[in-house]
């Protein structure tokens, strides 16, 4: 068995490729079942965010397993192999484990150290458990990754003042406003007519950062108006006007700055729509949805400026240097957590031998106990029989404790295999199985 991950991220693929591979929660079960149905894949879980799609698996054979996952991604995206392959990465075993730890800690994020990725890894664990696509190996790995992410944020400075995709989007708007005025600095949004389209987690973070940046008010649109009103209630100090998504045209006609973050599969704003509107001002669109909510052709419309998640690099690079130093602190934690998981994985090699040893001793115990009880006669009470049986089981457990502990302890693989062979020979057990 082998741990493997195949995927792509903001580091390897532009948003126009990433959006084709995005797997929304409503189709996650189908995707997991499809992958789990492949005889090469024993366990699987999927991490799908605006900046990455990564499929973590336990496979029978690394090359064949990775090939099966790549085939699935090609079918899911509709992209030809030659168009998709250059954007994919894959890691096997210890590299896959180390990569997941980095992802959960936020060290592989566009915004270094951002906290939202940890929530997304938790969601990956929850969906994998709900849809029963994970077994003991991935459960252990992903649970430890979540713990690692928490540990990095509590034991290092990386989580201090960490920014997110949403906060970077707000800063990008401030930067573009400043550049439009001939200043390469962040400008206040106080005079902007701002709208947020969508009422999910990203929109919540947008409202949080807009309020912190001094925004004077926001128009909040959502398909379900009630959800928008529920969200706005959490920001009593920020004037929020809630509207249904049907009022999108009005929003685009009156606002000067519009953020979009919906779960729509197709763009909700394109050039043909904007050309029909009588706009009152210059319109700046910032789209943090994946798939994208804003069609790429809007840049052809006069008086319209559009940015997507890939454009966040411009603002993120301005404050990454200090965070790079903080990331070095986190690397120590990641190396330790990766080592701990791999030691646990190596210890699994001893499990078949331990189980056979326990079964052998249990059979001997049961046989000898039965012989002894048969000689006790009818005067031996049921209570006394239970006491003797418990005594015999306790003796077996005491005998097994030290050898089992030693077989599971961290050690070089050749030494462990030699110990397993000795135990198997002494107790006439079957040879231990090799664990890849």
UniProtKB/Swiss-Prot annotation:
One of the GO biological process terms: chlorophyll biosynthetic process
Superkingdom to which the source organism belongs: Bacteria
Pfam families registered for this protein in UniProt: GlutR_dimer, GlutR_N, Shikimate_DH
Residues reported to bind substrate: 49-52, 109, 114-116, 120
Database matches in CDD domains: NAD_bind_Glutamyl_tRNA_reduct
Entry annotation: catalytic residues: 50 (nucleophile)
This protein's record includes keyword RNA-binding: no
EC number annotated for this UniProt entry: 1.2.1.70
Reaction equation(s) it catalyzes: (S)-4-amino-5-oxopentanoate + tRNA(Glu) + NADP(+) = L-glutamyl-tRNA(Glu) + NADPH + H(+)
Biochemical pathway: Porphyrin-containing compound metabolism; protoporphyrin-IX biosynthesis; 5-aminolevulinate from L-glutamyl-tRNA(Glu): step 1/2; Porphyrin-containing compound metabolism; chlorophyll biosynthesis
UniProt enzyme class: oxidoreductase
Entry keywords, A to Z: Chlorophyll biosynthesis, NADP, Oxidoreductase, Porphyrin biosynthesis
Residues bound to NADP(+): 198-203
Site feature Important for activity, where: 99
A GO term for molecular function: glutamyl-tRNA reductase activity
Task performed by this protein: Catalyzes the NADPH-dependent reduction of glutamyl-tRNA(Glu) to glutamate 1-semialdehyde (GSA).
Entry similarity comment: Belongs to the glutamyl-tRNA reductase family.
Subunit structure: Homodimer.
Misc: During catalysis, the active site Cys acts as a nucleophile attacking the alpha-carbonyl group of tRNA-bound glutamate with the formation of a thioester intermediate between enzyme and glutamate, and the concomitant release of tRNA(Glu). The thioester intermediate is finally reduced by direct hydride transfer from NADPH, to form the product GSA.
Domain note: Possesses an unusual extended V-shaped dimeric structure with each monomer consisting of three distinct domains arranged along a curved 'spinal' alpha-helix. The N-terminal catalytic domain specifically recognizes the glutamate moiety of the substrate. The second domain is the NADPH-binding domain, and the third C-terminal domain is responsible for dimerization.
Name of the protein this chain belongs to: Glutamyl-tRNA reductase
Organism field: Prochlorococcus marinus (strain MIT 9313)
